[in-house]
Structure formats: C-alpha cells, structure tokens
Amino acid sequence: MQFVNSGISVTDLRKTFGNSEIIKGVTLDIEDGDYVSLTGKSGSGKSTLLYMISSLDPPSSGTIKIDKKDIYRMNEEEIHEFRNKRMGFIFQFHYLLPEFTAIENVLMPARKAGLLKEYQSYAEHLLEEFDLKDRMNYRINRLSGGQAQRVAIARALVMNPKYIFADEPTGALDSTNTKVVMNILEKVNRETKTTILVVTHDPDFASKTKRQIHLVDGRVVSLKEFEAIKKSVKTAR
C-alpha cells in the first residue's frame, strides 16, 4: 500500500481535565521512518500525548496531522478506516481475546477489514518470526506474558501499518522479554521503515530509539533541561 510521504505534525497541542492542563502547547514533527520515544516521569503526560497523536483521545485544542490529514476533522467512518489501514497499536497489557488462538488474535484487524484470507500467510509468517510457530493454535491463557505480548505486536503489524503507537509495551515484562520486544521493534523500524512512537520510562529502551522527546509537566523540553530537572530532583531527595 502506498502512503503520502509526510509523517506526523503536531501544533500547539493542549489537553485539559477539569481545571488542570495536562498537555501544555506541545508542537513537534515526526518524519516518515522515524523511531521516537516519549520519556519522562510518571504523570508527565506521555501516555496522554500518545493517545491524542494516535487519534484515540481528542485534544482540548491544537492540531494533529498525519499524512497531511487533520485526524480530528475526519468523521467516524473515515477515522476508523484510517486507523485500520495505517496504524497499529501496542499497549502495556496485550488486550488479546482469550477465547481465540494466537493466530486468530493476530488476524483480528484483517477480519474486520474483510481481508482474512489475504493476510493469513503473513500472520503466520509474523508468528514464526517472533518464535511462536509452535504456539499459533494455542489460546492466550496457555502463553506466557512475553509470548502474549509478541502476539499483540504481530497483531499490530499484520496490516502493514505505516505507524505503530506503543504505550509502555514492556512495562509488564521481565528483563528477558523486555529485550525481546525492544529488539523486535528496532528490527521492524530498520527493515520496514515503519514509523514508531513509543512511550517508555525505561532509559535503556529509550536509548534504542533514533530520537527521544522528553516531557516534563506536560511540556516538551530539551535534553539539557530534562537532565537538569532530573538532577535537581535527586539533589532535593
């Protein structure tokens, strides 16, 4: 599938809950093929920003354009089609359907698009790539946490999306499975040029990405300012 070469553009994005402004005028650009991490302490607004950029939560104000399209000006049918064809999502919890097998879960996006047969072999290929060939027909409750998360990643990739949005994808995993997931995402970006935006509190994970965006109290800050703030917090302790 051919996509417009334009990436993600965020302008003066704000999010308010009650009287509290959580995201404070964020402006940023993410180029096609980039691999970007959103870092910052808990409560800094990382996940909120990711959800807005990925069309899952509307901003209070500001604009988000993906491939030159203002995603919050689309109607429900348009945004559903846009997500299904161009976006893949990975979360801390896998949200797989326990009554279905690994391969059936991977194929859910294709089933929704009416393209089950067209993507069957590719779904099998992904599970083989993720060392799950002998687990394809296992139900989710027979898989380990790391195996289930790999199934979730395969599900996110099965429609060949241009963009992957991942919210703490290793947050519930042990160190061994964390490295597996990190390596998978790095390989996907390198080999397919899929644009990846990932939220992580893990500095080792962030260091594997091509670029880090640092959030402090809902604002994007420079690396120098980010390090200075971290240092001042440690000193205060």
Swiss-Prot record:
The answer to keyword Amino-acid biosynthesis applying to this record is no
In its UniProt record, which GO terms are filed under biological process?
A: transmembrane transport
Q: Which residues form the ABC transporter domain?
A: 8-236
Query: Which SUPFAM superfamilies does UniProt cross-reference here?
Result: P-loop containing nucleoside triphosphate hydrolases
Q: List the disulfide bonds.
A: none
Identify one Gene Ontology CC term for this UniProt entry.
plasma membrane
Pfam families linked to this entry: ABC_tran
Molecular function (GO) terms listed?
ATP binding; ATP hydrolysis activity; transmembrane transporter activity
Q: How does it assemble?
A: The complex is composed of two ATP-binding proteins (LolD) and two transmembrane proteins (LolC and LolE).
Please explain the role this protein plays, according to its UniProt record.
Answer: Part of the ABC transporter complex LolCDE involved in the translocation of mature outer membrane-directed lipoproteins, from the inner membrane to the periplasmic chaperone, LolA. Responsible for the formation of the LolA-lipoprotein complex in an ATP-dependent manner.
UniProt name for this protein: Lipoprotein-releasing system ATP-binding protein LolD
Instruction: Give the gene name.
Output: lolD
